[in-house]
Amino acid sequence: MSNNQTLFERAQRTIPGGVNSPVRAFRSVGGTPRFVARAQGAYFWDADGKRYIDYIGSWGPMIVGHVHPDVLAAVQHVLADGFSFGAPTEAEIEIAEEICKLVPSIEQVRMVSSGTEATMSALRLARGFTGRSRIVKFEGCYHGHADSLLVKAGSGLLTFGNPTSAGVPADVAKHTTVLEYNNVAALEEAFAAFGGEIAAVIVEPVAGNMNLVRGTPEFLNALRALTAKHGAVLIFDEVMCGFRVALGGAQQHYGITPDLTCLGKVIGGGMPAAAFGGRGDIMSHLAPLGGVYQAGTLSGNPVAVAAGLATLRLIQAPGFHDALADKTRRLADSLAAEARAAGVPFSADAIGGMFGLYFTEQVPASFADVTKSDIERFNRFFHLMLDAGVYFAPSAYEAGFVSSAHDDATLDATLDAARRAFAALRA
């Protein structure tokens, strides 16, 4: 029995399903999860000592690779001064200033510890600001595991075939309206029917939790126009795509200004950190200034802030995002070319440092399109690549991530493995 198998069996005795986040269990793809022993750059090593090229990067945060020396030094520097204080620090101000500088739509920002906290708090704030209850989200978009957002959500729920979680009260779900992603007509109909009831529309401008699906400019511009017309708050959930699609996030890429933005992953540099922020007149409704309560013992944790601040400074290097986008596009286009050469139905897309792999002929534009993917063939591909030392997301419903640490050698090795995998899929 391998060390991975031994650890998984041991974990299942004390941890539900043996994991602390469902997608890690390999339930969709089958087999034994890889237990990570260490990581460096674009690689990690499992409990059996096998090395993998990592295209998950902790589900997005590791944009500069694992254990970047500058991030490591920043964390080591603050550790001797204390791990957590429950009181303000200068570093909190520094990271807030950095976020506001990089994302101009954010005039004020509040730090939290997870993406779920960020989206949950942003929605509460939008409801408090507008005095309305209804929220609008989109099918297949995942915004964390708050009750009102686990209605036709994406990510891990799709992996397990359950679009809506058990345990979500009907009285909570009734305030959530779910529309089709990229469907402008459905959006216009919803606002015509009950626009005056809508507190907020929350959207992933680049969805990464039903695999990678881009918002169309027409769709996102319609969102901005309709929310402004009806007095609803437009919330961009950029927990995944923030600082990764572009330095200023998807809102910079599309040239659209939301009212509130949720951030995470990259801003923690691998540590538990997230944030939400936006217009000052909305943010002023948060306690202690206003009546919308939000708090957190570990919000603005000094160790997490140090890692995040170091990462944000690294990604401002000239040409960083151009280089990241180029290598991610090369990966996606080359994988698609290898599949075509092998006669395997397949498509791929990339934007910034995110990519999507689909066992369909066309790149999807909605949740319905994503569900047409050949899941069985994806699962076979996943294991062929895993055996070759390439670690893609263990689900057909997750985006992948490239870091600045991925170089030509890692991309070449990935494509060599993919060539063999696609040939095996054709056989």
UniProtKB/Swiss-Prot annotation:
Reactions catalysed according to its record? (S)-4-amino-5-oxopentanoate = 5-aminolevulinate
Pathway involvement of the protein, from the record = Porphyrin-containing compound metabolism; protoporphyrin-IX biosynthesis; 5-aminolevulinate from L-glutamyl-tRNA(Glu): step 2/2
Q: Which InterPro entries match?
A: 4pyrrol_synth_GluAld_NH2Trfase, Aminotrans_3, Aminotrans_3_PPA_site, PyrdxlP-dep_Trfase, PyrdxlP-dep_Trfase_major, PyrdxlP-dep_Trfase_small
User: What's a single GO CC term here?
Assistant: cytoplasm
Q: Which residues carry this modification: N6-(pyridoxal phosphate)lysine?
A: K265
The UniProt GO MF terms for this protein read: glutamate-1-semialdehyde 2,1-aminomutase activity; pyridoxal phosphate binding; transaminase activity
The top EC class, named as a word, is isomerase
Which SUPFAM superfamilies does the entry link to?
PLP-dependent transferases (SSF53383)
Question: What GO biological process terms does the UniProt entry carry, in alphabetical order?
Answer: protoporphyrinogen IX biosynthetic process
Q: Which cysteines are joined by disulfide bonds?
A: none
Q: What is its main location?
A: cytoplasm
Cofactor or coenzyme needed = pyridoxal 5'-phosphate
Q: Where in the cell is it found?
A: Cytoplasm
Enzyme nomenclature, EC number: 5.4.3.8
Q: Which UniProt keywords apply?
A: Cytoplasm, Isomerase, Porphyrin biosynthesis, Pyridoxal phosphate
Listed under subunit, the entry gives: Homodimer.
Q: Which family does it belong to?
A: Belongs to the class-III pyridoxal-phosphate-dependent aminotransferase family. HemL subfamily.
HAMAP family xrefs: HemL_aminotrans_3
- Protein's UniProt name: Glutamate-1-semialdehyde 2,1-aminomutase
The encoding gene is hemL
